[in-house]
Amino acid sequence: EAEMQWLTALAGVALLRTIKATPAVRLDSELSLKWPNDLLLGGRKLAGILCEHVDLAASGHLVIVGVGLNIGALPEAVKDFAATIECSLDSSSREDFIDAFRGNLVDCISAGDLAAWRESYASLVAVFGRECPVHLPGKAVLSATPLSIDDHAHLVCQSREGEIFTVTTGELSPTPLVEGHLS
């Protein structure tokens, strides 16, 4: 069960490592992770990750890991909050990239325990210690400072009043909001 809670975070770590290790990818800014499921390039969204669990009853279960990665030109309307990578990946190189991502994900999951997962993920999150809007379910927004990740891959924050609380579902906006879009 712990693997399921951490899968999205570990997929982010694996994707970041894969991009950095791919010679055909040219980066012009720093890569970082944004809790719970985004990869940022220079503070703008480069990729999103979604994991879906499928229960197969008696035969077990499987998880589908979906990754949306911006490659090539972006529409003008999204350039303030989205990023893209320049790369030259032909179809066989794309297959190699996907294989490398899968291998990195298996390595991340196999690498150990909760402490190792938390350390790997937290070392790549750029917003710790920086106040930003936290969007909660039901359209509630509060200003808080992300502090850490707990054992369940949830975000631990501190309110302006000093209260420590855990966010299990929500979205951070570490960069300025563009009308109608979370960063």
Where are these regions (language model features)?
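Long, positively charged amphipathic alpha-helical accessory segments at protein N-termini or as interdomain linkers
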Residues: W6-E30, L41-S183
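Short, polar/flexible loop-turn hinges at active-site or ligand-entry regions and domain interfaces
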Residues: E1-A2
